[in-house]
A protein has these predicted regions:
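Positively charged, low-complexity terminal tracts
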Residues: 1-93
Length: 93
């Protein structure tokens, strides 16, 4: 799967979405919560990215585990929406 952390569609206010470049923020959060070397390496790829980042399903699940409690729920939802190919309000809670 591919996620572009430079173009996350984040709900910044109720029912208002903005596209934000959060690759460094997400990369640092994944790095801080990385339980394995593989997730540490993913964090570095995200942090250094200038566009979409390719990752396996296992890496994606590791990313979600690493950022749980590290990032705002709205940012995590933006990551999930992009991974699922869903925009805006259509995302599941």
């Amino acid at each position: 799967m591919t996620i572009d952390f430079t173009k996350l569609n984040v709900e910044t206010r109720i029912d208002c979405f903005d596209v934000l470049d959060l690759h460094e923020v997400v990369g640092e959060a994944v790095f801080a919560g990385a339980p394995t070397l593989a997730i540490d390496e993913l964090a570095r790829r995200i942090f250094k990215s200038e566009g979409p980042v390719e990752m396996s399903e296992q890496e994606y699940n590791g990313l979600l585990g690493a950022v749980n409690g590290q990032l705002a729920f709205r940012v995590i939802q933006a990551i999930r929406r992009q991974a699922e190919g869903v925009d805006g309000k259509e995302a599941r809670p």
